[in-house]
Amino acid sequence: MVDKQRTLPELLAPAGDMERLKMAVLYGADAVYLAGTDFGMRAFAGNFDPDELKAAVAYAHAHNVRVHCTINTMPRGDEIVRLPAHLERLNDAGVDAVIVADLGAFTLAGKYAPNCQRHISTQASISNYVTANAWYDLGASRVILARELSLEEIRTIRENTPAELEIEAFVHGAMCVSYSGRCLLSNYMTGRDASRGACAQPCRYHYALMEEKRPGEYFPIEEDEKGSYILNSRDMCMIDHLDDLLDVGLSSLKIEGRAKSAYYAAIVTGAYRHCLDDAAAGRPIDPVWRDEVEHVSHRPYATGFYYGYPGQYYENSRYIREWQVV
């Protein structure tokens, strides 16, 4: 049972557009994360133009919800020159924090968005306390850890970093087969750059083996006649393990899914909100909320790397869609 005196972490929900932002806010998010039309890792999420961003911040703040804006691509020289103006717009709109991965973007954020906290993206692959402390010394107020860490590794980071440094981790949603999204497959195979939010997800393709001297003959790795899903990942779901997440001292629990539906934003945010509130009150988790996250479109659930190295899911990459919104 969770100590009801324990400080609850922030519940951070995705907001791909205004409709999804409203769902996340109304269903209990403490904060939302979104992107402008540039510099975000979800190019097809909808995102917010400058006027929409102002309206989004105003709506969230009216409900006492914080807004974090992603600038977590790795900008090239022709892109970085546009970043100061973008940062100034975020600062003027009242965005609470910017999420960055590139050191240059981090530096510019300190200059052009002084009212915004600087959070270090999972794209930076922070996996140890030395790296976390280095970012803190540079002025970061939060680090978003690599998804590949176990609970014990997170505990070690928390025990060896200043209490003022907030630590955020993903607890629900899609996972990348590459190390915290650092994947070149999409760029190589389709020309769509994953580091600029345009990943084509070739890890979800149907693969088979072909022997060099037998072109055209394909050998399934598993029994699936379409080939094996050798790079495929399950989706993360930690709703049954909130006690363990709270024990390691996380400051923020993050839900993946800016490209997902408004229904997803509502159901998943609401389920985690109720479970966290139950934890705060010392109540056992009601299994109805675990059932709720089964109602959204998802791949088979797993706990990621939190309890060690996960097994591979070879069967297929299809979403489970057993429920419809009416």
Residue ranges of each PLM-predicted region?
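Alpha-helix capping/helix-boundary segments
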Residues: G104-A105
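Conserved phosphotransfer cores of two-component systems
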Residues: A113
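Short beta-strand elements of ligand-binding domains
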Residues: C69-T70, V100, I120-T122
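Surface-exposed amphipathic alpha-helical tracts and adjacent flexible/coil segments at the periphery
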Residues: M1-L26, A31-L34, D38, H63-T73, ...
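Aromatic- and glycine-enriched glycan-recognition loops and surfaces
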Residues: A45-K54
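Gly/Gly-Pro- and Ser/Thr-rich, intrinsically disordered tail segments characteristic of DNA damage-repair
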Residues: V81, C116-Y129
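Long C-terminal interaction/binding lobes of large macromolecular proteins
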Residues: F39-M41, A58-A60
